[in-house]
């Protein structure tokens, strides 16, 4: 009887405790309130740097072609040989010319109203007198050295008959051939004079027309 009473007491106690647990109210849940929003700080305006105005590029000076430039000189070609050969033949057969004498051929002097290649004319004249059988020509090197002594370039003409005779004496020549082109440059006239160096006497002269090629 005693054991049964204990068992019943324990059972009743257990049921009582279970009922108490079931009737316990749940713990209150605290409501989480959102934190108050902080007012945003006003943003400071970013200072703007004023843009530098673009300076328009200044136009450069207007270049004009030089309208005053002289035109290129017209190059003329002459038939020097055609004009010189007949005169050289007459000179070699002239009276008073001693065979074997030394002849100085001066550069052709341009006395026309324009520009012409006097060096070409001089070279043609020397070629026409080469191997002539009567004169020994003063070499171009000897003539060049004699001109340099007078302060002239090898291409310069002596200009006057007196200078030509003076040069001829310095190089030991007996005769000097003085030549000049004169008149209109488009149709010049070639004049040749053979002079005796010792006296300056003109022992032969001739002239002829020079045509362009």
UniProtKB/Swiss-Prot annotation:
Give positions of region: Disordered: 28-74
Please provide the record's keywords in A-Z order: Cell outer membrane, Cell shape, Lipoprotein, Membrane, Palmitate, Peptidoglycan synthesis, Signal
Q: Which Pfam family would be a valid example here?
A: LpoB
Localization per Swiss-Prot or TrEMBL: Cell outer membrane
> Where would you say this protein principally sits, based on its record?
membrane
Q: What's the domain of life for this entry?
A: Bacteria
Ranges of Pro residues composition bias in the record: 36-50
Q: Which PROSITE patterns match?
A: PROKAR_LIPOPROTEIN
A GO cellular component entry from the record: cell outer membrane
BP term (GO), one: regulation of cell shape
Gene disruption: observed consequences:
Mutant shows sensitivity to many beta-lactams. Absence of both LpoA and LpoB leads to a decrease in peptide cross-linking and to cell lysis.
Q: Where is the signal peptide?
A: 1-19
Give the family per the record: Belongs to the LpoB family.
Q: How does it assemble?
A: Interacts with PBP1b.
Q: Which PANTHER family match?
A: PENICILLIN-BINDING PROTEIN ACTIVATOR LPOB (PTHR40593:SF1)
Outline what the protein does. Regulator of peptidoglycan synthesis that is essential for the function of penicillin-binding protein 1B (PBP1b). Stimulates transpeptidase and transglycosylase activities of PBP1b in vitro. May also contribute to outer membrane constriction during cell division, in complex with PBP1b.
Q: Which HAMAP family match?
A: LpoB (MF_01889)
What is the protein name given in its UniProt record?
Penicillin-binding protein activator LpoB
The gene for this chain is lpoB
């Amino acid at each position: 009887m005693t054991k049964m009473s204990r068992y019943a007491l324990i059972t009743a106690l257990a049921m009582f405790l279970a009922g108490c647990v079931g009737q316990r109210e749940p713990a209150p849940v605290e409501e989480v309130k959102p934190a108050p929003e902080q007012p945003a700080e006003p943003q400071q305006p970013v200072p703007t740097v004023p843009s530098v105005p673009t300076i328009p590029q200044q136009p450069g000076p207007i270049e004009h072609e030089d309208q005053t430039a002289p035109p290129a000189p017209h190059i003329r070609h002459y038939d020097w040989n055609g004009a010189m050969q007949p005169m050289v033949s007459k000179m070699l057969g002239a009276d008073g010319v001693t065979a074997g004498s030394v002849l100085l051929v001066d550069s052709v002097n341009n006395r026309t109203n324009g520009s012409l290649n006097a060096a070409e004319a001089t070279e043609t004249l020397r070629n026409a007198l080469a191997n002539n059988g009567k004169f020994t020509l003063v070499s171009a090197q000897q003539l060049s050295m004699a001109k340099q002594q007078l302060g002239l370039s090898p291409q310069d003409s002596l200009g006057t008959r007196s200078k030509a005779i003076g040069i001829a004496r310095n190089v030991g020549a007996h005769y000097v051939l003085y030549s000049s082109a004169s008149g209109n440059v488009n149709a010049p006239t070639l004049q040749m004079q053979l002079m005796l160096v010792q006296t300056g006497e003109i022992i032969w002269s001739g002239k002829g027309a020079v045509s362009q090629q």
